[in-house]
Every structure is written in C-alpha cells, then in structure tokens.
A protein has these predicted regions:
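Bacterial N-terminal signal peptides that target proteins for export
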Residues: 2-12
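Bacterial N-terminal signal peptides
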Residues: 10-20
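Surface-exposed extracytoplasmic segments
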Residues: 25-339
Length: 339
C-alpha cells in the first residue's frame, strides 16, 4: 500500500502529468471567491481523485491542495498548514452521490510545535538531515480521522509528520545532487527517485490507509495572465504556477473500505474554521471556539470561478453539494447569464 502514495506524490509534483495519467482527476482554480482569497491556509486549490491498483488491490487515491502561489523567495516561515483549520476530504457512495451527501469524510487536523522558542530561527536551526530531527525547529504533526456519516462514528486512523519546506541549504535533499546550492529536483515518476524527506513522511495508517501532508510543487497549469488580460490567449500558453508551491494532503483509501470498486463515487473537499475568534490587547495567542463553519469548498474544476456570479461565489464556498441543484443549477445550464 505504501507505494500508492509514492507514485502519487512525484506525479503531483510534475505539472500536468497527473491529469493525463489518472483515470479520473480534477484540477481547479486557486482564487475562487472573494472571501477565501483572504485566507491562504484555508484556500483550496485542487482536488484529485482516481482509482489505482496495487498488488491486486484497488485504492481510491485522493488529494487536496491549499495555500496557492507559495513564493519560495519569501522563505519557509510563512507557508504552513493552519492548526485552526479543519481540512476534510469527503467521499460519497451509493445514493449519496446523486444526493450530494458525503458518506464518509476524512479529517486532517494539524498541531504545530517548536523545539526551541528562544531563538529567532523559526523553521530551521541547522541543516535538516531527517524529518523532525533536532534541526527542524518548526514541526507540524497531523491526525487523520475517519467520520462515517451513516453511523456517526469517528475513528482516528493514525498520525503523521509534515516534512520541512524546501529552503535550499537548510533542506539539501530536495535539490539536485542533494545539494542546497542547486535548484530543486524535477518531478519524478518512480518511488526510487523520491527525495529523502518525502519518503520519510509517507505513513501507513490503520486499515491499510496511506497518507502524506506537506509542501509540493503546484501541478496546476494555466496561463492566468492571458486569461485575465481580456482572454488574449497565447499559443503556446505559459505556466503561471511554474516556480510556485502549495501544501498538499494526500490519502489513499482502500476501495473495500468504501464497499468495493464496482460503483461510482463522488469526491470533494472543504475547509472550515471555528465560528468565533476574540482578539484582545496583551494576549500572546488567540483561541478560536464554537462550531466549525465551512469557509471553502472544491470539487468540479473551475465551477465557482468560471461559472458562478460574484454575488453567489462566497455562498458556494460555504454550502454543501446537496443544495447545488437548488442554488447553482442556473449557472450550469446557462453560462451566458454571468458574462
């Protein structure tokens, strides 16, 4: 099972190849709605889902990207998963597919730790040789929980650790010839070619699930400049995401956990924040509280940005697919109405 994500991750780092290689995958936009563009850590970029067979056993490989356009030149400190965001990958099976209801949801929750807070060196204290070693000052851990909406049960599948962000000399094994002086390694196609940090961060969870969470090259391809320049498209187009990273959560789900592989399944993802957050003078940290409120949603590529009118974009981000027919059907049927 471990090889399943070992194949997903290098493909996800090779722009465009994942879509061509997979049986069913979707990539989508990065700036869907006004409010979510102000919240990078909760801003969903892409959702991928495809079936793959490993050693006679089929799995549903899913992935959710967040934090668009991570500029490597800014340094490693800014780009991380948010402890205060609930990241979820939802899978619908059986009658739930047509109803737009999640049958099972998989939650990623993060916890950030510092080994030394009495230093200005936030991410790295020295060269990181292994994930979560003494040199990786800022380390993020995560828990994956399976929520079965049919029974209401919640089962923790396991935990993982996020590898360090790529920062040249501090993380040399991300780069060509394992040297921080060289550019980042190109996307790869085999397990053997994966970098050291990624290999160490792929975890096998309970019941045969496999997970990864960490920084990846952005595999989405779009000539965004020409699109927004009044559709003055270029041939060939230019990769606007080239050179930028994002943060990716990937989960391989055994198909027998979903009732077998002879069925149709629907996949979408959401991000949520706590309802309340109080800011006060003199506090080192604010603690959000209250129920989870959905702030981002991603499923069919480009639907929200490309078809939904401005007045409904934030509403789309904060609703479930179960109400799509009622609220957003008009955009699927009459595209001219929003141009």
């Amino acid at each position: 099972m471990r090889t399943t994500l070992r194949k997903l991750l290098p493909l996800a780092a090779a722009a465009g190849f994942l879509l061509a290689a997979s049986t069913s995958a979707s990539a989508s936009s990065h700036m869907d709605a006004p409010l979510i563009t102000l919240d990078d850590a909760a801003n969903t970029t892409d959702v991928y889902a495809f079936v793959q067979e490993e050693n006679g056993r089929k799995v549903l490989v899913t992935a959710l990207g967040v934090y668009p356009f991570e500029e490597p030149g800014i340094g490693p400190n800014k780009f991380n998963f948010d402890d205060d965001v609930l990241y979820e990958i939802h899978v619908a099976t059986g009658r739930d597919v047509a109803a737009g209801r999640a049958t099972v949801s998989y939650q990623f929750k993060f916890d950030t730790k510092f080994k030394n807070q009495k230093t200005i060196l936030q991410s790295y204290l020295n060269v990181v040789k292994d994930v979560d070693d003494a040199a990786q000052n800022l380390t993020q851990f995560y828990t994956v929980t399976k929520v079965d909406h049919r029974t209401g049960s919640q089962d923790v599948l396991g935990k993982g650790v996020v590898p360090p962000n790529n920062q040249g000399n501090a993380t040399p094994f991300y780069n060509k010839d394992d040297s921080g002086e060289n550019p980042a390694k190109d996307g790869v196609a085999t397990e053997a070619e994966l970098d050291r940090y990624t290999k160490q961060s792929i975890v096998t969870l309970d019941d045969g699930y496999v997970a990864f969470a960490g920084q990846r090259d952005d595999g989405f391809f779009a000539d965004i400049q020409s699109i927004f320049d009044l559709l003055k498209l270029r041939n060939p187009g230019k990769d606007s995401q080239g050179g930028f990273n994002l943060h990716l959560m990937a989960l391989a789900i055994p198909m027998d956990e979903l009732g077998g592989d002879q069925q149709t399944a629907g996949v979408y993802a959401t991000t949520s924040r706590r309802r309340f957050r109080i800011l006060a003078d003199g506090l080192k940290k604010t603690e959000p509280f209250g129920d989870w409120v959905q702030v981002g949603r991603q499923g069919n590529p480009l639907f929200n940005e490309g078809l939904v009118a401005i007045e409904d974009k934030d509403l789309y981000s904060r609703t479930q697919p179960s109400v799509d027919r009622e609220l957003f059907r008009k955009y699927a049927e009459d595209r001219k109405s929003v141009v």
